[in-house]
C-alpha cells in the first residue's frame, strides 16, 4: 500500500510546528501513514526535533504545489492529507483533475473554509474554491465546521476531528482550586491577527462592562505587527483607563501564556468563524467561560460537550459570568472530546480513512 503523505501547504510556523510535533510524539510510532510530510517553510530545527518524521521543506506555496501535483499524477494511488488548505494552486489542481478526489483529504482549520476576505482577488477565487471543494474525497473538521460545510457540499463525506492543541491533561482539575472574586479580567482575542477584530471587541466589552474590568489583549503573534498593535492600544485607551488595559506585544512562551490565561475570568471572541480552538481549550481547561459570536459554529461543539456558552448578543454582567464559571467547574474535563488525549482517537481514525485502510 502507498504511504499517505501529509501536506502543510502554507508557511504558518506556529500551527505547522504544532502538527509536526504532535505527529512525531503521538502518531508516528504506531502508523506508517503518519510519517511523510511536505511542508512550506524553513526547517528551523524541526527535522531534529521530529526524528520520527520524514519532512521535505519547500520555499513557497507554488513549489510545494507543483511537487504535490507531480506526485499525484505519477501515481493515482498516492493519497494526500492536507492540514489546513490555503494553497490556491492545489485547489485549482483538484478542480482541473491534476489531483483526483480519491487522492484529496482535507482537515479544515477554519480560515481555509470561510469566505471573509473582501479583497478582489479573493472574491474572484472563492467561487472556484467552492467548486473544488465539491471534489474533496473527505473533510475532517469540528462539529460546527462540518455543519457549515455540509450546507453547501452535502454529498462530501465529513468526519469529526480536532486540531491537536498542546495540553497537559493533569491540569484539568487545577481550576477548581481558584477563588474568583473582585474585579474581573477579560481576555480579548487569541492573537494579534486582525481576524480577532480587536477594536470592535474592545468596544463590545466596554459596552457590556464599562471601565469596571481589566482587559488583556495578547498580540505577540504574528511578528512585525507593531503598527496594528499601537492602533489597538490607542483604541483601547479611549475606552479603558490605563490600569485596566494590558496590550501584550511580546510573544509568550507556552507556560507564560498558560499562566496569563489562568489570571482571566472570561474569554471574549467576536470573530464570526471557528478559530482559536487552542486558546478556547486552555481557557475551558482552566474553568474560564468564553463569549462567542453566534456565527462561530464552534458553539455546537461546546454544547455537545455540555459546556456553557455565552454569546456576544447576550446581556452580560458579573453574576452571569460567575454562574458560567460554576457550571464549567462541574464539568468532568477528562471527558471533553476536543481535549488531549481524547482527540487522539479521532486522529487514528482519520489516518485510517485517508490511507484507505477503512471505508
UniProtKB/Swiss-Prot annotation:
InterPro entries: WecF (IPR009993)
Involved pathway(s): Bacterial outer membrane biogenesis; enterobacterial common antigen biosynthesis
A Pfam family the protein falls into: Glyco_transf_56
Transmembrane domains' residue ranges: none
One cellular component term from this protein's GO annotations in UniProt: plasma membrane
Keyword Electron transport: no
SS bond partners: none
Keyword set, alphabetical order: Cell inner membrane, Cell membrane, Glycosyltransferase, Membrane, Transferase
EC number(s) per entry: 2.4.1.325
GO terms (BP aspect): enterobacterial common antigen biosynthetic process; fucosylation
Source taxon at top rank: Bacteria
Subcellular location(s) per record: Cell inner membrane
Any one Gene Ontology molecular-function term assigned to this protein's record: 4-acetamido-4,6-dideoxy-D-galactose transferase activity
Catalytic activity: beta-D-ManNAcA-(1->4)-alpha-D-GlcNAc-di-trans,octa-cis-undecaprenyl diphosphate + dTDP-4-acetamido-4,6-dideoxy-alpha-D-galactose = alpha-D-FucNAc4-(1->4)-beta-D-ManNAcA-(1->4)-D-GlcNAc-undecaprenyl diphosphate + dTDP + H(+)
Top enzyme category: transferase
UniProt topology in membrane: Peripheral membrane protein
Family of this protein: Belongs to the glycosyltransferase 56 family.
Function: Catalyzes the synthesis of Und-PP-GlcNAc-ManNAcA-Fuc4NAc (Lipid III), the third lipid-linked intermediate involved in ECA synthesis.
Name of this chain's protein: TDP-N-acetylfucosamine:lipid II N-acetylfucosaminyltransferase
Organism encoding this protein: Escherichia coli (strain ATCC 8739 / DSM 1576 / NBRC 3972 / NCIMB 8545 / WDCM 00012 / Crooks)
Gene name of this polypeptide: wecF
Amino acid at each position: 500500500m502507498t504511504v499517505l503523505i501529509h501536506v502543510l501547504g502554507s508557511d504558518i510556523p506556529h500551527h505547522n510546528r504544532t502538527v509536526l510535533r504532535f505527529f512525531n510524539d503521538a502518531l508516528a510510532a504506531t502508523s506508517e501513514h503518519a510519517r511523510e510530510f511536505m511542508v512550506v517553510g524553513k526547517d528551523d530545527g524541526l527535522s531534529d526535533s521530529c526524528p520520527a518524521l520524514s519532512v521535505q521543506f519547500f520555499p513557497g506555496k507554488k513549489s510545494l504545489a507543483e511537487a504535490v501535483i507531480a506526485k499525484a499524477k505519477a501515481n493515482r494511488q498516492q493519497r494526500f492529507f492536507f492540514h489546513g488548505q490555503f494553497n490556491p494552486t492545489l485547489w485549482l489542481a483538484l478542480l482541473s483533475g491534476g489531483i483526483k478526489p480519491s487522492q484529496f483529504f482535507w482537515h479544515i482549520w477554519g480560515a481555509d473554509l470561510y469566505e471573509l476576505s473582501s479583497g478582489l482577488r479573493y472574491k474572484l477565487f472563492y467561487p472556484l474554491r467552492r467548486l473544488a471543494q465539491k471534489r474533496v474525497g473527505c473533510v475532517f473538521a469540528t462539529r460546527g465546521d462540518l455543519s457549515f460545510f455540509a450546507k453547501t457540499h452535502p454529498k462530501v463525506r465529513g468526519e469529526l476531528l480536532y486540531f491537536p492543541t498542546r495540553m497537559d491533561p493533569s491540569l484539568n482539575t487545577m481550576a477548581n482550586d481558584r477563588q474568583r472574586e473582585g474585579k474581573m479580567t477579560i481576555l480579548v482575542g487569541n492573537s494579534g491577527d486582525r481576524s480577532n477584530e480587536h477594536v470592535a471587541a474592545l468596544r463590545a466589552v466596554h459596552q457590556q462592562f464599562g471601565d469596571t474590568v481589566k482587559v488583556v489583549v495578547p498580540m505577540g503573534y504574528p511578528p512585525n505587527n507593531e503598527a496594528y498593535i499601537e492602533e489597538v492600544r490607542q483604541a483601547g485607551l479611549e475606552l479603558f483607563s490605563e490600569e485596566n488595559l494590558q496590550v501584550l506585544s511580546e510573544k509568550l512562551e507556552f507556560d507564560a501564556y498558560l499562566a496569563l490565561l489562568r489570571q482571566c475570568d472570561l474569554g471574549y471572541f467576536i470573530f464570526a468563524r471557528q478559530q482559536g480552538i487552542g486558546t478556547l481549550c486552555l481557557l475551558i481547561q482552566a474553568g474560564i467561560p468564553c463569549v462567542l459570536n453566534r456565527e462561530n459554529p464552534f458553539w455546537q461543539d461546546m454544547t455537545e460537550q455540555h459546556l456553557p456558552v455565552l454569546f456576544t448578543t447576550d446581556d452580560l454582567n458579573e453574576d452571569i459570568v460567575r454562574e458560567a464559571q460554576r457550571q464549567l467547574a462541574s464539568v468532568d474535563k477528562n471527558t471533553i472530546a476536543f481535549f488531549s488525549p481524547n482527540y487522539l482517537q479521532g486522529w487514528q481514525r482519520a489516518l485510517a480513512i485517508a490511507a484507505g485502510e477503512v471505508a
